[in-house]
């Protein structure tokens, strides 16, 4: 796996699924392929994206700045600086300075990532902030190691939170999660339908599922009534894909 592929993998792991994630993936691919060369436009686009947390925007802004060539005097962006200040905690800043000194001695991506993983997310963000504000310089490879360590820590905490929700025994949360997943699956079916001959059928199934979820939410139903809803939808989707000659086992 190439270095840039690895960076793209880690960065995308902290972005919530949805159309925006697909859009960001495309921007990252373009940036890494040298196709998107206007850093100002790219940063303005990033600043106005909805849903993303300030820290996620900070990480993406840092990656774009590292990768896209820019004029030396180009102004640093406030939204990135604010996201990478370690919540203004002096303790984070102290640790960031110590980490920076260690990173200066590293020359490889993996070495930098290994060193960075022993620090907290706040300290890692502060260290990125130091480098972003030109208070310190490291090689691009080492900076990418720092980025990936930060993403790994964020993804770990997101995974723990997700696992807690999936494992919850609260029937109301499980019920709502099944309905949200059914709606998301229906939306994916509509997007995949495109203009094929079978599109009408897929759209019909998706539309019925959306209406069912809407009705269940409006009138209120027993928490067990949504069981199997997403699975039924996925079966319909896979049957549709087979007829289309498409195999997408990974969809689940």
UniProtKB/Swiss-Prot annotation:
One Pfam family named in its UniProt record: Flu_M1
Residue segments, region RNP-binding: 165-252
Principal location listed in the UniProt entry: virion
Subcellular location: Virion membrane; Host nucleus
Any single Gene Ontology cellular-component annotation: virion membrane
Motif annotated as Nuclear localization signal, chain positions: 101-105
Segments of this protein annotated with the region Membrane-binding: 1-164
Bilayer topology term: Peripheral membrane protein
GO molecular function: RNA binding; structural constituent of virion
GO BP, one annotated term: viral budding from plasma membrane
Gene3D superfamilies in the cross-refs: 1.10.10.180, 1.20.91.10
Keywords: Host nucleus, Membrane, RNA-binding, Viral matrix protein, Virion
Described function: Plays critical roles in virus replication, from virus entry and uncoating to assembly and budding of the virus particle. M1 binding to ribonucleocapsids (RNPs) in nucleus seems to inhibit viral transcription. Interaction of viral NEP with M1-RNP is thought to promote nuclear export of the complex, which is targeted to the virion assembly site at the apical plasma membrane in polarized epithelial cells. Interactions with NA and HA may bring M1, a non-raft-associated protein, into lipid rafts. Forms a continuous shell on the inner side of the lipid bilayer in virion, where it binds the RNP. Determines the virion's shape: spherical or filamentous. Clinical isolates of influenza are characterized by the presence of significant proportion of filamentous virions, whereas after multiple passage on eggs or cell culture, virions have only spherical morphology. Filamentous virions are thought to be important to infect neighboring cells, and spherical virions more suited to spread through aerosol between hosts organisms.
Comment field (misc): Most abundant protein in virion. When expressed alone can form virus-like particles in transfected cells.
Subunit text: Homodimer and homomultimer. Interacts with NEP. Binds ribonucleocapsid by both interacting with genomic RNA and NP protein. May interact with HA and NA. Cannot bind NP without genomic RNA.
Family under the similarity heading: Belongs to the influenza viruses Matrix protein M1 family.
Record protein name field: Matrix protein 1
């Amino acid at each position: 796996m190439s270095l840039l592929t690895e960076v793209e993998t880690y960065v995308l792991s902290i972005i919530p699924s949805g159309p925006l994630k697909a859009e960001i993936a495309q921007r990252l691919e373009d940036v890494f392929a040298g196709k998107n060369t206007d850093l100002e436009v790219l940063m303005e686009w990033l600043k106005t994206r909805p849903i993303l947390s300030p820290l996620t925007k900070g990480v993406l802004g840092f990656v774009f700045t590292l990768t896209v060539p820019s004029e030396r005097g180009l102004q640093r962006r406030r939204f990135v600086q604010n996201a990478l200040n370690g919540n203004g905690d002096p303790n984070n800043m102290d640790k960031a300075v110590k980490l920076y000194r260690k990173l200066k001695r590293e020359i490889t991506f993996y070495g930098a990532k290994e060193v960075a993983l022993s620090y907290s997310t706040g300290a890692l963000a502060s260290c990125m902030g130091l480098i972003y504000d030109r208070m310190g310089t490291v090689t691009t490879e080492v900076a990418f190691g720092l980025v990936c360590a930060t993403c790994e820590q964020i993804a770990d905490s997101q995974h723990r939170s997700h696992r807690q929700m999936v494992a919850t025994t609260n029937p109301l949360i499980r019920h709502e999660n099944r309905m949200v997943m059914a709606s998301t699956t229906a939306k994916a079916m509509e997007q995949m339908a495109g203009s094929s001959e079978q599109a009408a059928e897929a759209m019909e199934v998706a539309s019925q599922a959306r209406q069912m979820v809407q009705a269940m939410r409006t009138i209120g139903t027993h928490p067990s009534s949504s069981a199997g809803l997403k699975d039924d939808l996925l079966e319909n989707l896979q049957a549709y894909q087979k007829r289309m000659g498409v195999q997408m086992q990974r969809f689940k």
